Amino acid sequence: MDKLKHTLFGLEFKNPVWTASGTFSYGLEVAKIYDLSLLGAIVVKGLSLKPRKGNMPERIVETPAGMLNSIGLQNPGVDYFINETLPKLKKYDTKIFANVFGEDEDEYLAVAERLDKADGVHGLELNVSCPNVKKGGIAFGTDPEVLYNLVYKMKKITKKPLLVKLSPNVSNILDTADACVSAGADGLVLINTLLGVAIDVEREKPILSTITGGLSGPAMLPIAVRMIWQVYQKYGSRIPIIGVGGISNYKDALQHILAGASAIQVGTANFYDPLSPLKIIEDLKNHLDKKGYVHYSQLIGKAHQMIIKEV
């Protein structure tokens, strides 16, 4: 029996190790380094209706235990992805999820409609950390009512699995998780980046051109694990969770899984070690063998059970 092979959303995955949207671009760059078919899934860089140039420099700054980025969702547009990139990407035997974003509901729905018809796209990941221009710039993912309406309408558009990548920039992650579950989301991705600011003390001004940026990297690990814990504690296996945030090695991945994640995504680690997803896959197998587990699913949410046993 393959200890990592599993089924989620009606799809069969080789393993629970995915690449996160953004740091892996569209996968083809990394295909020069290793066979993408070894991965559980690839989540491609965010796609909008029209091409976007992104933000002006500076767009990235290193921070203790991570980095801040304000790329501005630079991408060639959904049509270019479908016509030019996807035909090359779908040659690999792995699952492909498209990250979707928009400046308003209409753009989200238009992008989803195109991707729903695209052969080779197995599912959609909804990026709700974007500012809603029709609601004064408030991010979709911070308003449960707005989020519910968006997810509900997206589910009417697509028959493919719809995952919602939740923002940690909220007072209570359960409020937005509840909205997504009620609206019919097939899964939750926890979590997106946390807003931060870095200041150049010599120039006495913010480093990033946009002032704020999204914090990612090892610093995010305990925050992501905490939010996965909260959502799993409420929903258990009723809603699959994909964990992302601070994963650099198999022990980090195990923290996500033990807290309740059914699969994990590797993000920032791809920058400094492109082979990190493959190392995590191999190390997870070795860990399961060493511990005598038949399948990795035995570990999903197990940390919750251990607390009950100890009490």
From Swiss-Prot:
It holds the Pfam family DHO_dh. The keyword Oxidoreductase applies. Substrate binds at residues 45, 69-73, 127, 192-193. It catalyses: (S)-dihydroorotate + fumarate = orotate + succinate. GO terms for cellular component: cytoplasm. GO terms for biological process: 'de novo' pyrimidine nucleobase biosynthetic process; 'de novo' UMP biosynthetic process. It is found in: Cytoplasm. One of its GO terms (molecular function) is dihydroorotate dehydrogenase (fumarate) activity. It is an enzyme of class 1 (oxidoreductase). Its EC number is 1.3.98.1. InterPro entries: Aldolase_TIM, DHO_dehydrogenase, DHOD_1B, Dihydroorotate_DH_1, Dihydroorotate_DH_1_2, Dihydroorotate_DH_cat, Dihydroorotate_DH_CS, Dihydroorotate_DH_I. Binds 1 FMN per subunit. Pathway: Pyrimidine metabolism; UMP biosynthesis via de novo pathway. Its cofactor is FMN. Keywords: Cytoplasm, Flavoprotein, FMN, Oxidoreductase, Pyrimidine biosynthesis. FMN binds at residues 21, 45-46, 99, 127, 165, 191, 217, 245-246, 267-268. SUPFAM superfamilies: FMN-linked oxidoreductases. Its main location: cytoplasm. The active site is at 130 (nucleophile). NCBIfam families: PRK07259.1 (NF005574), pyrD_sub1_fam (TIGR01037). Homodimer. Catalyzes the conversion of dihydroorotate to orotate with fumarate as the electron acceptor. Belongs to the dihydroorotate dehydrogenase family. Type 1 subfamily. This is Putative dihydroorotate dehydrogenase A (fumarate). It comes from Sulfurihydrogenibium sp. (strain YO3AOP1). The lineage of its organism: Bacteria, Pseudomonadati, Aquificota, Aquificia, Aquificales.
